[in-house]
A protein has these predicted regions:
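Domain-level signature for proteins that mediate thiol-based redox and metal-cofactor handling
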Residues: 1-67
């Protein structure tokens, strides 16, 4: 699975639950909330003041290291 800024957080977490650590790290502690699960990575990063490209790169590097 490759993550993009348009990827929906709920979809990411359903397929790769270990990625929750990256969302927690940016202060997104409401991962179970329906609203946050429907947000794109880009939307969540905007709300939490985080660079979406950097977060996407971190998550994709993590996922690549698993394979």
């Amino acid at each position: 699975m490759e993550i993009t800024k348009q990827s929906i957080i709920g979809d990411i977490l359903d397929r790769e639950p270990e990625t929750a650590q990256f969302f927690f790290a940016i202060g997104m502690h409401c991962l179970g909330c329906p609203a946050s699960r429907g947000e794109s990575v880009e939307q969540a990063c905007a709300v939490h003041g985080t660079d979406a490209d950097a977060l996407v790169a971190q998550i994709n590097a993590f996922l690549a290291s698993k394979n």
